[in-house]
Design a protein with these regions (language model features):
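Active-site-proximal alpha/beta segments of enzymes that process anionic O-linked groups
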Residues: 2-176, 296
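Intrinsically disordered, low-complexity regions enriched in proline, serine, glycine
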Residues: 12-14, 33, 92-93, 201, ...
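Short amphipathic alpha-helical face segments that pack within enzyme cores
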Residues: 19, 78, 180-187, 263-267
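Substrate-binding rim/cap in mid-to-C-terminal beta-strand-loop elements of soluble/periplasmic
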Residues: 52-69, 168, 219-274
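Hydrophobic, well-ordered secondary-structure elements that form the walls
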Residues: 83, 208, 264
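Polar, surface-exposed loop/tail segments
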Residues: 102, 247-266, 270-321
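Histidine-centered active-site microenvironments of extracellular/periplasmic hydrolases
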Residues: 105-113, 194-200, 205-246, 285-308
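A long, amphipathic alpha-helix that forms part
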Residues: 136-157, 161-217, 223-227, 231-235, ...
């Protein structure tokens, strides 16, 4: 399950999504005397402090996250295709029209059809970039998306399934509008958790880059840092079975390792293929697979000493923090 909010830094999420962050935090370990203690036996959550964007705009990051390559490579295959090929029921919800999404981000990719799809396409309602509540039928736009996502997750509770909920609530210059979605996201996650509908599920809450829209923040060091460090939080179910022990150890260590969208892409592939993932060939320009040669699954060991932003040809290395 992917919860994607465009243009949200980790710091902004902590400020404006306080209830949602508390949901993730209650599954994080803490020091209890000489040992680590875990609040919940079957769930564990992680936050990634050094998750770094490639560019300060979506087209420079989105294809890497979900296609495993840059927009310069033509006919990219969306990760969803591999999910469908492996029997997953797929769902996609967005507050941006498919036509606009295709024009802006996906003109270099192959189109993909989901089993279920919901789009809010009224331009009088979406008002992307505007620092106001974006409402439809008396509720914030995101309410309808997350409600549809909940219906999907409930209907297919006994099936292998994938859901991507994509919103632009962080895509405005005041950094305030995002807070109106906090209750919506929190209630969505809490409801599924209380009904035990997150079992055998990994939740990835992610953004492609931090806040970048024109505002007074452009003049501050605050902008320079947050714009390059988007949020990434992961909730894993069934912690005790991570072969789990090595995988758990690695993802815990990787919270403090320099990572990118390539690692996010490979993590989805690892979740999909499990132990077979290590035998999958790397993606090349002629050969498309769910594994990028430029990244590693967050459940695997990543040597921090070999992570250098200068090794990525398409990264603005001067912005690294």
């Amino acid at each position: 399950m992917i919860l994607y909010i465009d243009s949200v830094s980790r710091a902004l999420a902590l400020r404006q999504l306080k209830k949602t962050m508390k949901f993730f935090e209650k599954f994080m370990p803490y020091h209890g005397g000489h040992h680590m203690k875990y609040p919940e036996e079957n769930y564990h959550s992680f936050q990634f402090f050094k998750y770094h964007s490639f560019r300060m705009f979506t087209p420079g990051n989105f294809p890497i996250l979900f296609y495993g390559n840059t927009k310069e490579v033509k006919d990219l295959v969306l990760m969803t295709r591999y999910l469908k090929e492996n029997g997953y029921v797929t769902n996609y919800c967005s507050d941006e029209c498919k036509k606009d999404n295709t024009r802006t981000h996906h003109n270099m990719t192959q189109s993909e059809i989901y089993d279920h799809q919901m789009l809010l396409c009224d331009p009088n309602v979406v008002l992307m970039n505007k620092p106001i509540k974006k409402c439809l039928y008396g509720n914030i736009n995101s309410y309808h998306l997350y409600n549809y996502g909940k219906q999907f997750w409930t209907k297919y509770k006994d099936n292998r399934k994938f859901s991507a909920l994509v919103t632009n609530d962080g895509h405005e210059s005041t950094l305030e509008a995002l807070k109106y979605t906090d209750d919506i996201i929190y209630n969505y996650l809490t409801s599924l958790y209380d009904q035990n509908l997150l079992k055998d599920t990994t939740v990835l809450m992610v953004s492609d880059h931090g806040t970048v829209l024109p505002s007074i923040y452009f003049l501050s060091d605050f902008f320079q840092k947050e714009g390059r460090l988007p949020m990434l939080f992961i909730l894993v179910n069934d912690r005790k079975n991570m072969s789990y022990y090595d995988q758990y150890y690695h993802i815990q260590k990787n919270q403090q390792t320099f990572i990118t969208g390539y690692d996010f892409y490979n993590t989805i592939g690892h979740l999909l293929y499990g132990d077979k993932y290590k035998d999958i060939e790397n993606k090349t320009n002629e050969h498309d697979t769910p594994k990028s040669p430029f990244g590693e699954s967050l459940f695997n060991y990543i040597n921090p000493m070999k992570r250098n932003p200068k090794n990525y040809q398409n990264m603005d290395t001067h912005i690294c923090k």
